[in-house]
């Protein structure tokens, strides 16, 4: 299996759409694999959007100016939403709508702060995973390893395309709401001094606010989507690395063919490989700890608030559908992380089984046997995606959250009745 030919593309549009073109090229060529890991491509997308705040980007005046500009736009949008709350007091449906988008913007702001603080450390992790991806595998495991890398890349890209399709569709619906809901003049309910948001009093200011709202939220939701894909893809690459390790272990005896020296070298290499995965996992959990905590709190708030608003707006189907979409997107976001966290933990548990299958008590010296025992013992502890003190991201805890949401829904339904 070969990598696609590398072409020098530095334009922002090439960077932004690069992973989609790459996935199509890999899909069309059965023997080809991606030139880079998903996290590498998503980092390029963030650079194309002009909001990846590592030391390299901070040295570019044009990029810094752009970051200040869009940050001011986001802060202005948040301030106008807060100012608009005063008009929604007494109307549960509109107040809930304002709070949903205020919470979303606060979440985006937190992600911006996170990247400003940890972009350099993320670069180190991405580069380490990129190096692992390009390691050459020799022996009987070669074909299966390359096919695994290709399949993982295509599956994740299919998920990214699906996620972005829903995200952009949602934004288009929100931007178009003033055209089919008479009571709404802007995509998001805001209030400005001197009634600048009123189209009958200030038509030019209204158009500027409308365009600013639409472009700012479209930009930052796309940015947020890329950021989430990057975060998940880091753990997905660790999952892929664990899968590659398992494949190599299951082909270890066939590769060495009784050569004890080769067996010892390969076993030590794989032990160090496993140790590197553990260290990268610990580093990722440390970096994302605050982001995970904020993410779980925001998801719980959005789901609970959306459930309440769906019940409160049951006499207004259009508003109820809008909140239902928000709730489904929030649950989709949480399930996105939970599923990949679950895959990561389960794949890490397979390593101990693969080491056990590779162990042959009739082959090797005592030092080799001790190495196998050490490897099996260490691999029995599963790796997890976790934010202390919260439980790990997996499907079991995801179902627990769904049960809590259902309990809240029941209480709210009884209260409103």
Curated annotation (Swiss-Prot):
Disulfide bonds: none
Tissue-wise expression: Expressed in olfactory sensory neurons in the antenna.
InterPro entries named among the record's database cross-references: 7tm6_olfct_rcpt
Cytoplasmic topological intervals: 1-62, 120-152, 228-290, 338-393
GO biological process: detection of chemical stimulus involved in sensory perception of smell; signal transduction
Other facts noted in the record for this chain: The atypical heteromeric and topological design of the odorant receptors appears to be an insect-specific solution for odor recognition, making the OR/Orco complex an attractive target for the development of highly selective insect repellents to disrupt olfactory-mediated host-seeking behaviors of insect disease vectors. Odor-evoked OR currents are independent of known G-protein-coupled second messenger pathways.
Highest taxon listed in the record's lineage: Eukaryota
Self-association and partners: Interacts with Orco. Complexes exist early in the endomembrane system in olfactory sensory neurons (OSNs), coupling these complexes to the conserved ciliary trafficking pathway.
Record Pfam families: 7tm_6 (PF02949)
Ranges in the topological domain labelled Extracellular: 84-98, 174-206, 312-316, 415-417
Protein name per the record: Odorant receptor 65a
GO MF annotation, one: ionotropic olfactory receptor activity
């Amino acid at each position: 299996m070969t990598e696609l030919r590398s072409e020098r593309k530095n334009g922002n549009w090439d960077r932004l759409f690069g992973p989609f073109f790459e996935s199509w090229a890999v899909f069309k060529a059965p023997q080809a694999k991606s030139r880079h890991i998903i996290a590498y491509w998503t980092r390029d997308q963030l650079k194309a959007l002009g909001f990846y705040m590592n030391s390299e980007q901070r040295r570019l005046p044009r990029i810094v100016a752009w970051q200040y500009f869009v940050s001011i736009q986001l802060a202005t949008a948040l301030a106008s939403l807060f100012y608009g709350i005063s008009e929604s007091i007494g109307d549960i449906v509109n107040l809930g709508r304002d709070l949903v988008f205020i919470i979303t913007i606060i979440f985006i702001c937190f992600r911006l702060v996170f990247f400003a603080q940890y972009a350099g450390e993320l670069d180190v992790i991405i580069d380490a995973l990129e190096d692992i991806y390009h390691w050459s595998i020799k022996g009987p495991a070669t074909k299966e390893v390359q096919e695994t890398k290709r399949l993982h890349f295509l599956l994740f890209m299919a998920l990214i395309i699906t996620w972005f399709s829903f995200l952009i569709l949602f934004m288009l619906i929100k931007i178009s709401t003033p055209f089919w809901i008479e009571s709404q003049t802007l995509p998001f309910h805001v209030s400005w001094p001197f009634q600048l948001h009123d189209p009958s009093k200030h038509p030019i200011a209204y158009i500027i606010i409308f365009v600013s709202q639409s472009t700012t939220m479209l930009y930052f939701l796309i940015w947020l989507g890329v950021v989430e894909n990057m975060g998940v893809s880091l753990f997905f690459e660790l999952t892929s690395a664990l899968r590659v390790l398992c494949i190599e272990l299951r082909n270890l005896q066939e590769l060495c063919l009784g050569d004890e020296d080769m067996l010892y070298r390969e076993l030590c290499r794989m032990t160090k490989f496993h140790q590197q995965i553990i260290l990268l996992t610990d580093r990722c959990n440390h970096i994302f700890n605050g982001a995970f905590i904020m993410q779980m709190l925001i998801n719980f708030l959005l789901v609970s608030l959306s459930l309440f608003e769906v019940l409160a707006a049951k006499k207004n189907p259009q508003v109820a559908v809008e909140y239902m979409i928000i709730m489904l997107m929030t649950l989709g976001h949480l399930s996105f992380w939970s599923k990949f966290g679950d895959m990561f933990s389960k794949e890490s548990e397979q390593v101990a089984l693969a080491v056990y299958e590779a162990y042959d008590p009739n082959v090797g010296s005592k030092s080799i046997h001790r190495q196998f025992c050490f490897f099996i013992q260490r691999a029995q502890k599963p790796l997890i995606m976790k934010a202390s003190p919260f439980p790990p991201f997996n499907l079991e805890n995801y179902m627990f959250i769904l049960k809590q949401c259902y309990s809240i829904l029941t209480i709210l339904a009884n209260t409103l009745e």
